[in-house]
Regions:
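OB-fold ssDNA-binding interfaces and closely related basic DNA-contact patches used
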Residues: 1-115, 156-186
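OB-fold/S1-family single-stranded nucleic acid-binding modules
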Residues: 128-156
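Beta-strand-rich binding-surface signature
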Residues: 79-81, 122, 135
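Glycine-rich loops and low-complexity Gly/Arg-rich segments
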Residues: 119-121, 149-151, 162-165
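Elongated alpha-helical scaffolds
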Residues: 114-131
Length: 186
């Protein structure tokens, strides 16, 4: 179960508009997970929001088993940072999944023997409502081979997801070279 191998348990009391990050839009959002927690192209951690030295609201991320870098007014939330293909934007992006229900839905699918590794099928998340009235529903699409041009784009994309823990850009020129693997997860 390589997709789940490096996920860590989080204590229960822990708290798109294009570009490099996928933002869920109202209605249907279709994407394919490309990365893996095993090779670091997907990561999990904790996310808290606070003001930086200039007074700007800024995200602070750290690994699940690490100490929070500071105190936060609001409880930090667990997140998965997933490298995905966003079909609407036709681009590789990072989708930061913070909603507990969506994380649980993803884990349920990944553990299900009929669905398994979510890199082998597309996912659709339907977003309805605004603010505290927002609801989400995740639905898997039937298994299908990923298009060759998406696989090529993935191979050509250099990303260092651990940069998120340092408050840096994972797509920056200094991103680490990823080691090629023989396994085709798609």
């Amino acid at each position: 179960m390589a997709f789940l191998d490096n996920l860590k348990e989080v204590p229960q009391n822990s708290g798109s508009g294009g570009g490099k990050y996928m933002k869920l839009q109202q209605g249907s959002n279709l994407f394919r997970i490309l990365g893996s927690f095993e090779d670091g192209t997907n990561i999990q951690g904790m996310l808290g929001w606070a003001e930086d030295e200039e007074g700007n609201r800024k995200p602070f991320r750290w690994e699940v088993d690490q100490e929070a870098p500071r105190k936060f007014k609001e409880n930090p939330r667990q997140f998965y940072a997933l490298l995905v293909w966003n079909y609407a934007d036709e681009a590789i992006q990072i989708y930061e999944m913070t909603q507990a229900k969506l994380r649980q839905d993803l884990l349920t699918l990944a553990k299900d023997e009929d669905w398994g590794d979510p890199r082998k099928y597309d996912l659709k998340i339907v977003r309805n409502g605004e603010g505290l009235e927002t609801s989400y529903a995740m639905t898997p699409s039937p298994h299908k081979k990923l298009a060759a041009e998406i696989i090529e784009a993935f191979k050509d994309t250099k990303v260092d997801m651990s940069a998120l823990y340092r408050g840096e850009d994972p797509f920056a020129e200094s991103a680490q070279e990823e080691e090629a693997t023989e396994e085709d997860p798609f």
